[in-house]
């Protein structure tokens, strides 16, 4: 909805009232788009699970289709928040978006086993095996780099996130949070083969993990939209 805020069109009181109306409309639009996106995600997640019933164990192996999909999602989310960081010049929250980008980068590094997946060793009964970090030339640096990135991320989140607004003003995405917890539980149970007690549990684990990463990205984008809305309101 476009509103002409030219001073000659109405008084200061009218301006304030219409600005409030416009911000309320924008807030409603954020909620609508988010809930619509979440509904589309749920339908697609269910439809995509059906073909997985006919796949073999190799589909969930390291460097398999599900693992690659996880890496693509995390890479996209990292790039998305780097883009937000770049375009937030002059904003007090610019470094917050940079911290979120680093968080997704850490998750991506974890899924890539810190680069181990690029050093194939042999094919084992459970799938491809890779050299350990101790056997890779840069392995001794990994822990130091990861810890530094984690500290940088935690500092950025605690220092630059508007925690008061997050707790008191910004709506909580309760449905999304519940879905993330459910996916995390399924991933953990699947890893221990405690769902169906078959090798298909590995596929459930990897698929649940993929959905969890997508939902975390949804959540990060939810707060990005609301913090931007909060900035515009002020």
Where are these regions (language model features)?
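Alpha-helical transmembrane segments
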Residues: 33-49, 178-183
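Juxtamembrane "helix-exit" motif on the non-cytosolic side of transmembrane helices
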Residues: 49-59, 160-162, 188-198
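Hydrophobic cores of alpha-helical transmembrane segments in multi-pass inner/ER membrane proteins
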Residues: 70-83, 142-156, 209-227
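Membrane-proximal helix-loop-helix units in multi-pass membrane proteins
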Residues: 110-167
């Amino acid at each position: 909805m476009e509103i002409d805020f030219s001073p000659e069109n109405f008084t200061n009181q009218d301006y304030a009232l219409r600005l409030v109306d416009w911000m309320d409309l924008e807030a409603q639009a954020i909620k609508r788009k988010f809930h619509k996106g979440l509904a589309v995600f749920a339908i697609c997640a269910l439809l995509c699970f059906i073909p997985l019933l006919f796949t073999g164990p190799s589909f969930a192996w390291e460097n398999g289709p599900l693992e690659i999909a996880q890496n693509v999602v995390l890479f996209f989310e990292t790039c998305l928040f780097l883009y937000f960081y770049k375009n937030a010049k002059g904003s007090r929250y610019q470094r917050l978006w940079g911290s979120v980008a680093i968080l997704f980068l850490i998750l991506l590094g974890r899924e890539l086993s810190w680069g181990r997946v690029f050093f194939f060793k042999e094919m084992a009964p459970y799938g491809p095996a890779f050299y350990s970090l101790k056997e890779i030339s840069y392995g001794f640096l990994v822990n130091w780099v990861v810890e530094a990135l984690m500290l940088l991320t935690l500092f950025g989140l605690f220092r630059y996130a508007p925690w008061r607004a997050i707790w008191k003003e910004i709506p909580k995405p309760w449905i999304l949070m519940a879905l993330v917890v459910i996916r995390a539980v399924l991933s953990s149970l699947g890893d221990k083969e405690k769902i169906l007690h078959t090798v298909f549990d590995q596929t459930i684990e990897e698929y649940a993990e993929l959905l969890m990463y997508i939902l975390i990205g949804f959540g990060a984008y939810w707060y990005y939209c609301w913090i931007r809305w909060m900035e515009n309101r002020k």
